[in-house]
Amino acid sequence: MKYILVTGGVISGIGKGIIASSIGTILKSCGLRVTAIKIDPYINIDAGTFSPYEHGEVFVLNDGGEVDLDLGNYERFLDINLYKDNNITTGKIYQHVINKERRGDYLGKTVQVVPHITDAVQEWVMNQAKVPVDGNKEEPQICVIELGGTIGDIEGMPFVEAFRQFQFKAKRENFCNIHVSLVPQLSATGEQKTKPTQNSVRALRGLGLSPDLIVCRSSTPIEMAVKEKISMFCHVNPEQVICIHDVSSTYRVPVLLEEQSIVKYFKERLHLPIGDSASNLLFKWRNMADRYERLQKICSIALVGKYTKLRDCYASVFKALEHSALAINHKLNLMYIDSIDLEKITETEDPVKFHEAWQKLCKADGILVPGGFGIRGTLGKLQAISWARTKKIPFLGVCLGMQLAVIEFARNCLNLKDADSTEFRPNAPVPLVIDMPEHNPGNLGGTMRLGIRRTVFKTENSILRKLYGDVPFIEERHRHRFEVNPNLIKQFEQNDLSFVGQDVDGDRMEIIELANHPYFVGVQFHPEFSSRPMKPSPPYLGLLLAATGNLNAYLQQGCKLSSSDRYSDASDDSFSEPRIAELEIS
């Protein structure tokens, strides 16, 4: 097993996750089996109870793990399925050690950070690195580990010490440290400054880790003189200084790394049985990055949500839309609309914001209402859903978005004016959306219906069924505590709103579709968590196809989005023969 530790310096949020994912992608393109681990040095057990404004979206794994959004990057880049134990937190480690102490496993010893916490970290990493993640039963060969935060943070000290010890346990030829640092550029002079990187590397060395590669993040390409200066003062060869500047798309990052001979370096440094360059997989990434930059036609989608001030709150939704837009050769223009801005109260308090929000909604080719919690902003979401339904605008509702679509239809089409969710009105006269009793204990953490679940199609005449490849059932990831009341669905199906997908027992409503509408679909699950750059999510793909006027032609062509499909490379903008560009990982 080979271990690649990715650390960061100067500031957080400079792209360690993307760089770690890109490194894994390059090594996978060389024919190696790759897994990934993210370490978050916070005391929370997992990310399940975080506000989206704290760390961005909560990403959900197949096994129901609620984890950091970086694991979503790993899954998308590497096309793998990780587990909740691939996300290590300080809380998990301390809980694990304290439980062992309570059982008496330490035989009365004084339990300390060193060696007990550090040993637990090393043991966890070694055990989890062996777990297959690509659908095969073969053990991974490479484990990419990202240490969250920045070097010098007090929260991360036990983990840094753990890896200081681990580098000797694993042996030099099996352990490599990549340090990601910021090279700021002064706006007044345009000069790129190396001092922050020098200090960061010095701090890392002072803690016992020496970087094998220094990845320099900058707004513009780094000059050779700057690269040589970093090489000299940080005591590494020039080829060990990798420069990653801001690019138009993250698809370009693996290509930038590969162009700087990173494969050759890993081959020599870790004694890998590979060639000096990446294979056909990376060629597809290069082609995808090139195509992304050549796109001309634009598709505008309005995302109506309550967490729009921080884009990371909807990271997977954005990626799923981007994957689908790229697949049909369109550039995505995603317009974030705070749902409160669509409400009447905003018209009174801030008319300018109200009219700007409605102008965005009216200009959109398609409307998306994603998942969320709480009553704030729900009236605005209902307004957006009503607009999409009545004006025949393609619409996709996810989780809460689907529940609100059902409520909107009940109020405006079935005259059930008191229809509501018990999440918002516990004593609603018409409880259209109800809580699931088995998922309603006292604690909030990990108490929802989580992880991958099977959804069975009730009818063959379903748009989503066709988009999924005309299969009888699908498996997607869930994260919800409320569901549509199954006792009230008959009225809907008599009025063109069909519940075309249900769980295996037929008790839970999973998919809705509205007849006589270009695309009005709601799903209880979160398909964005399963979307991949080369295998876009069918519900999101359907939204983009409908928004560009190509859905009917695509369905008539009989295209299927199964793992065995081979799609032709369509770099032009024509869609005369509906098809998906060649995006699939082989």
UniProtKB/Swiss-Prot annotation:
It comes from the Eukaryota. Pathway: Pyrimidine metabolism; CTP biosynthesis via de novo pathway; CTP from UDP: step 2/2. Pfam families: CTP_synth_N, GATase. One of its GO terms (cellular component) is mitochondrion. Keywords: ATP-binding, Glutamine amidotransferase, Ligase, Nucleotide-binding, Phosphoprotein, Pyrimidine biosynthesis. One of its GO terms (biological process) is pyrimidine nucleobase biosynthetic process. Signal peptide: none annotated. The active site is at residues 399, 526, 528. It catalyses: UTP + L-glutamine + ATP + H2O = CTP + L-glutamate + ADP + phosphate + 2 H(+). Its EC number is 6.3.4.2. CDD domains: CTPS_N, GATase1_CTP_Synthase. One of its GO terms (molecular function) is CTP synthase activity. Gene3D superfamilies: 3.40.50.880, P-loop containing nucleotide triphosphate hydrolases. Residues 563-586 are annotated as: Disordered. Residues 300-554 form the Glutamine amidotransferase type-1 domain. The modification Phosphoserine is found at residues 568, 571, 574. PANTHER family: CTP SYNTHASE (PTHR11550), CTP SYNTHASE 2 (PTHR11550:SF2). Catalyzes the ATP-dependent amination of UTP to CTP with either L-glutamine or ammonia as the source of nitrogen. Constitutes the rate-limiting enzyme in the synthesis of cytosine nucleotides. Belongs to the CTP synthase family. This is CTP synthase 2. The lineage of its organism: Eukaryota, Metazoa, Chordata, Craniata, Vertebrata.
